[in-house]
């Protein structure tokens, strides 16, 4: 198989969630963080035709960047190495023991969302850039005055999240149930793009899905999140 630029871009992004990857036959790539707080999935145009674990994905991508775009990637007959081969060079990258990395066994099904809204890529970029400039470490997606709003906080200085340093209105909210979904900025590892954001909560369980055209992500919420949704 060949790795297209789009597939490489997804893999580079997934290194920010976890350092390794499990490649399986098909068109789906999955990853998750060690803590399980972040999960990513992507449907790629390339077709993976082998199964192999990569322990150091950044290193693998760096090596892949040294060969031409036409390089073929395959698995050795004894499954000990991943072979990268172009017109003139052949590179043998060691395949890892799958037990040495963490990876999702299958796609995570997301429950029916309680709240859905669209987040533009330009708004996401602004959100993250402002976070860097203001040292924001926490976001809260909530409802206020009939709107869905994302607040940004510096929780180190504002443990109760009472003083938002940044607010972004994302759309109208027609529901009656109040909610507050708290996200650790460190888990915001998405590729800059437009996303459909889905909020789900039941009892003391919370999750948010960022569904994009190139990749989708599910993020666990932080302590202090709350909701008034009814089953």
Where are these regions (language model features)?
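Long, charge-dense
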Residues: 98-117
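DNA polymerase processivity clamps
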Residues: 1-94, 113-231
């Amino acid at each position: 198989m060949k790795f297209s630029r789009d597939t490489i871009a997804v893999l580079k992004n997934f290194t920010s969630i976890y350092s390794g990857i499990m490649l399986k036959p098909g068109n789906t790539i999955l990853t998750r963080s060690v803590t399980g707080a972040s999960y990513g999935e992507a449907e790629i145009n390339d077709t993976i035709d082998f199964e192999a674990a990569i322990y150091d994905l950044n290193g693998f991508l760096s090596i892949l960047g040294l060969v031409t775009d036409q390089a073929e990637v395959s698995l050795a007959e004894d499954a000990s190495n991943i072979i990268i081969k172009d017109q003139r060079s052949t590179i043998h990258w060691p395949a890892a023991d799958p037990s040495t990395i963490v990876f999702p066994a299958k796609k995570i099904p997301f429950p029916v969302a309680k709240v859905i809204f669209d987040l533009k890529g330009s708004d996401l970029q602004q959100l993250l850039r402002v976070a860097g400039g203001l040292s924001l470490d926490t976001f809260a997606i909530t409802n206020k005055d009939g709107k869905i709003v994302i607040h940004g906080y510096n929780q180190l200085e504002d443990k109760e999240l009472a003083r938002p340093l940044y607010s972004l209105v994302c759309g109208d909210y027609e529901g009656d149930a109040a909610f507050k979904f708290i996200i650790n900025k460190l888990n915001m590892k998405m590729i800059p793009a437009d996303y459909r954001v889905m909020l789900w909560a039941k009892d003391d369980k919370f999750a948010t899905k960022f569904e994009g055209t190139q990749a989708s992500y599910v993020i666990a919420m932080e302590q202090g999140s709350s909701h008034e949704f009814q089953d």
